Amino acid sequence: MIVFLVFKHLFSLRLITMFFLLHFIVLINVKDFALTQGSMITPSCQKGYFPCGNLTKCLPRAFHCDGKDDCGNGADEENCGDTSGWATIFGTVHGNANSVALTQECFLKQYPQCCDCKETELECVNGDLKSVPMISNNVTLLSLKKNKIHSLPDKVFIKYTKLKKIFLQHNCIRHISRKAFFGLCNLQILYLNHNCITTLRPGIFKDLHQLTWLILDDNPITRISQRLFTGLNSLFFLSMVNNYLEALPKQMCAQMPQLNWVDLEGNRIKYLTNSTFLSCDSLTVLFLPRNQIGFVPEKTFSSLKNLGELDLSSNTITELSPHLFKDLKLLQKLNLSSNPLMYLHKNQFESLKQLQSLDLERIEIPNINTRMFQPMKNLSHIYFKNFRYCSYAPHVRICMPLTDGISSFEDLLANNILRIFVWVIAFITCFGNLFVIGMRSFIKAENTTHAMSIKILCCADCLMGVYLFFVGIFDIKYRGQYQKYALLWMESVQCRLMGFLAMLSTEVSVLLLTYLTLEKFLVIVFPFSNIRPGKRQTSVILICIWMAGFLIAVIPFWNKDYFGNFYGKNGVCFPLYYDQTEDIGSKGYSLGIFLGVNLLAFLIIVFSYITMFCSIQKTALQTTEVRNCFGREVAVANRFFFIVFSDAICWIPVFVVKILSLFRVEIPDTMTSWIVIFFLPVNSALNPILYTLTTNFFKDKLKQLLHKHQRKSIFKIKKKSLSTSIVWIEDSSSLKLGVLNKITLGDSIMKPVS
């Protein structure tokens, strides 16, 4: 007895020792794990920068996922794909569904000759079968794809109780009896997609207790009831893509407690209710894109505590409740793209702490701000309609789009060609206009009022060159780190002043060209009229044009709530809008300027020059010097053509883009950059050539100046040679000097006569 007690005591002591030893080991392991976790803490980076894995180095967003190893350890090129949500898991499961290697041996004794058999799996694809064939009852997989089976009668599979998978795609099945799947208690996967099914009777799946996958895609099914899914206690995945459903059952998951994945893409569902997903506690993936859902009640998703991915894209949702996503604490991926949403609440995504991917493509967000996206600390991918929106989510590693056609994450001007052109056109514009101003000031013109108008036009065009120079300068300033300063830049005073300068130059130039055209029109078409503005009237008109241009450019500054950031919609600060993302005020104003004032001015210029050419041609036919008149006609036609052509190059692209935007046609982003940098300044660069350098008056005056300069040079040379002769004669004889003076005097008198 004593021995037993001693043994029992020792055994208890050993158990206690082992318990403490195990506890100590666990503590060590936990400590080690904590240390490991602590050592993996990523370095804190400033806004817009992201860490290089476990290195202390941080890089701007532009250097991540750009195809180059900028970190040195490849961390900046890792995790670039948007793998959040459950799409990857589904692909893996779906892809490996039939991955088990089968032997070529067939274990079925009876099956049609047109079928292929491997072990207990039978494939009868494209066999022209009109009904389910007679086969051995030990079959586990039956594929009857692409046959001519149009109906499934009662108990058609009653003998095949071991069936686990049935594939009935592409048969144009129209009718399925209520007891067609009777007895299939082991069936796990059922494919009925790409058929002609219009209705499914309640209870049709009541014996399919083990069914996990049900695929009903591409069938013209118009209605489903809650009782349709009776018996589907194990259903995991339900797909009804591209059906004709207009409504969902009152409680979608009442008969499917294990339902994990629902795909209802491409139906005609018009509404959801608070009870639609009330019993869908296990749901992790919900796809509802390409439907006609106009409104989602606030508590629609309140019971979906485990939801990991939600897709509501391409619907007609115009407004979201501020607390719609409040209960989706585990949501990883949310797609709201291609909805006509006009407003997002500032706390719309406040509860989505685990969200990793947010898709807001083709959505206008007029009230966008950085606070809207700050709560989503785990957000790694975000998709916007506008590139400039990326500035409001600097903490997100991957932001799309990468450019707006003008700027990129790295540079204000994303295209190397644009960088070169902006300097070339700026130089040509400034130099050409300053040269004309100088020459016009130096050369005295008979028509001083016209010369004054041309000089004022050159001043306006020169402002466009100054604007382009500033674009080039700020491009250099922000080279390689533009996205870091993009938001500050577009909201800065400098950007707004640049936009104001460009708009002032553009509108004053347009109004001046219209005035000069009308002035010329009156002279040529009505040569005997007395409608001729004098110097004072011309000065008043020019002052009014500058005041009108100034007002057009400055009005957007008066009411920011109405116009928004009118000049800060893109990196080059020019208000050339072409999409639906602008404020109502700025949209109406820009349309009024570009399709109102500028289009009207362009049409007046084109009409005037056509009328002038016809008038000149008519006058020429009445003269006798046909040959000379023909030459003059060609010259005038060429000149008028290039004037109209330069206006067309400048403004037609703008008009086309604005008109297309009215019809909601998507315009390529790159088009904006070419219009702003290349097409729009064409007039400013060519006006000096067209209105001064190629005119006959300027050519004649230039020839006179050159001739006068040549005469002065010749006179200086002769005078120099004369002085040499006089010095030599003085050394020789005073008599010769007098004779030479007479000869020289005679030469000088005779020269003008000759």
Curated annotation (Swiss-Prot):
InterPro entries the UniProt entry points to: GPCR_Rhodpsn (IPR000276), GPCR_Rhodpsn_7TM (IPR017452), LDL_receptor-like_sf (IPR036055), LDLR_class-A_CS (IPR023415), LDrepeatLR_classA_rpt (IPR002172), Leu-rich_rpt (IPR001611), Leu-rich_rpt_typical-subtyp (IPR003591), LRR_dom_sf (IPR032675)
Transmembrane regions listed in the UniProt entry: 417-437, 456-476, 496-518, 538-558, 593-613, 640-660, 671-691
Every LDL-receptor class A domain range: 44-81
PROSITE patterns: G_PROTEIN_RECEP_F1_2, LDLRA_1, LDLRA_2, LRR
Residues on Extracellular side: 1-416, 477-495, 559-592, 661-670
Disease: Cryptorchidism: One of the most frequent congenital abnormalities in humans, involving 2-5% of male births. Cryptorchidism is associated with increased risk of infertility and testicular cancer.
Protein name per Swiss-Prot or TrEMBL: Relaxin receptor 2
